[in-house]
């Protein structure tokens, strides 16, 4: 019963993340909705606890990747694209960080 609750929670979380990440982009919202629903339906009859755990981990990783990596761009002119950064967007650029390294 606990795994059913985790699956349902992940399902809801993925849909909430989809709505946040693809806000006002109806084509992307619909495509993401269909893909999420399709993947959950495909694995609906899974009974193996190990496989369920693996799928939950994969779904959680996908949610984190969507939330922290996807940037939405909006066309303003024919040659202008404005990027909308969300608060959850991962902005670290570690390999090119300007801060000096601390010596130990």
Curated annotation (Swiss-Prot):
Compartmental location: Mitochondrion matrix
Chain coiled-coil ranges: 21-48
A Gene Ontology molecular function term of the record: protein folding chaperone
Keywords: Chaperone, Coiled coil, Mitochondrion
Matches recorded under InterPro entries: Complex1_LYR_dom (IPR008011), Complex1_LYR_LYRM7 (IPR045298), MZM1/LYRM7 (IPR050435)
Any one biological process term the GO annotation gives: mitochondrial respiratory chain complex III assembly
Primary localization: mitochondrion
GO cellular component: mitochondrial matrix
Subunit-level organization: Interacts with UQCRFS1.
Chain's role: Assembly factor required for Rieske Fe-S protein UQCRFS1 incorporation into the cytochrome b-c1 (CIII) complex. Functions as a chaperone, binding to this subunit within the mitochondrial matrix and stabilizing it prior to its translocation and insertion into the late CIII dimeric intermediate within the mitochondrial inner membrane.
Record family assignment: Belongs to the complex I LYR family.
Protein name per the record: Complex III assembly factor LYRM7
Provenance organism: Xenopus laevis
Lineage summary: Eukaryota, Metazoa, Chordata, Craniata, Vertebrata
